[in-house]
Amino acid sequence: MEEEKKSLNFIEQIIEDDLANGLTKDELRFRFPPEPNGYLHVGHTKAICINFGLGEKYNAPVNLRFDDTNPEKEEQEFVDSIMKDVEWLGFKWDKVLYASDYFQQLYDWAVQLIKEGKAYVDEQPSEVITEQRKNPAEPGIESPYRNRPVEESLDLFERMKNGEFESGSMSLRAKIDMTSPNMNMRDPVMYRILNKPHHRTGTAWKIYPMYDWAHGESDYIEQVSHSLCSLEFENHRPLYNWYLDQVYEEGKVKNKQREFARMNVSYMITSKRKLQRLIAENVVSGWDDPRMPTISGMRRKGYTATAIRNFIEKVGVAKRENLIELQLLEFCVREDLNKVAKRVMTVVDPIKLIIENYPEGQEEWLETENNPEQENAGTREIPFSRELYIEREDFKEEANNKFFRLKLGGEVRLKSAYIIKGERVEKDENGEITTIYATYDEKSKSGSGTEESLRKVKGTIHWVSAKHAIPVEVRNYDKLFTVEQPDAEKDVDFLNFINPDSVTTVQGFAEPSLKDVAVGEPLQFQRIGYFTKDQDSTDTNFVFNRTVTLKDSYKPE
């Protein structure tokens, strides 16, 4: 038992302690509460995996609740994309809920607090309220409206709700402690006037609850047992508990907030404002650009849900923030793709190769394996003919004994095909090689069982048949930024660190089977890297995104 406890993370330990102290397993309930004002990013994957992972571990329901309390920034488009991302990661929610479902209940509770003398309407501008709060070392200044009669606040609050006042002209504040060293407890704003239509409630409401008020009470309404959030909300916990104490009824589950470290990944930024700027300034093409740290961007790049979940598992649940290496994420992606990606042949820097002693007009279909890592992956047939494309870098006219690819007078095996020998080259007026001429050993066909086929040559290269090849556009993606923490320096614009070579596009040729692969299907371009078909592909233009390079020296600790 002691061994088992050691392997628990600190959140699981809290839950185990609560279960040991009277909470029943049936009372366990979790939630993932995104605000629908943008696309989910790599940082959110940790919160998703923690909450839904606990649901799976304890067989407890997990709600997907949209914290839709700011109609200025929220749209249905973001709701839809968030649902798609959570599903794609492989998680199932119990219910889809919205903070806006509780607007009436939250309003009624606010009225109750006013009646109890625990909230008041303040007519000061927000700038003045901020100024009066002072700083943790200096007590705040009480609002002149703090002790106004309850009836006055009740009347004004109802009129705020009815839309009688301008946006921002009044607010409802909780009456707590203007001398508290915790700034969140210095009479926080509970409601602000905002004459904006809401994506779900339309124009029914003219006032909207602030995050701290809506969040904890929504947890309570849903009877969430453990409200897990990132570390920046740690000093909001006293306010979370104060609000809860005002409405809590004996016999109900009293939700508790606990915090874990945010996940920051090197060479990435996750600030929504900065991501929006990347789009607005045309640095990237949109939220799902494969260079973006959004889940939709990573999916389009070819990252798998399994790889992302494995990454989160390796990162673990910590209490202290640290910078996670992008290489660890790429390691997890590479590890998963090695297992699942179909092996295909694509030449990204093509040069023509003609086998002079192969009969003109002849073609044959050769068997090749789909994935040596999967027993049941099977085989497929690829076309072979007299004229092929190979990689330009796989040939040298002259080379030393350490060059194991094709050279004049040297032999190499064409993968799943024959052994060939470099004979001569043709060049253009600039001295550039345009065509390589070779001969083949017709008895050396791979898998034929002949003595010649078993002959050992030092190199094997990939190729495609020129007659059958399909032209492909290959987008080689790299890091979007040139430094590990592009937004670390407040005085330096993060756009200064944009990598000018974050994407390079080349035209290549691929085996014809790539016509039929689905968008998003994982592929290994043999000897090159892992790729996936992009949504920009058409019936005549096939586009492939590089997901990650084939190898990296990085090994996780």
Task: Give the residues covered by each predicted segment.
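Long, charged, mostly alpha-helical binding arms that flank functional sites
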Residues: 253-332
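N-terminal catalytic cores of NTP/NDP-binding nucleotidyl/phosphoryl-transfer enzymes
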Residues: 6-83, 199-230
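Residue-level signal for inorganic ion chemistry
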Residues: 22, 51, 82, 113, ...
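A glycine-rich helix N-cap at a beta->alpha junction
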Residues: 78-104, 109-110, 117-120
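Conserved short loop/turn motifs at secondary-structure junctions
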Residues: 33-36, 65-73, 95-104, 127, ...
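Active-site cores that bind ATP or allylic diphosphates and position pyrophosphate for catalysis
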Residues: 68-70, 76, 98, 112-275, ...
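Core subunits and conserved enzymes of cellular information-processing
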Residues: 233-237, 241-243, 309, 313-316, ...
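Secondary-structure transition/capping motifs at alpha-helix termini
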Residues: 21-25, 53-61, 85-95, 220-221, ...
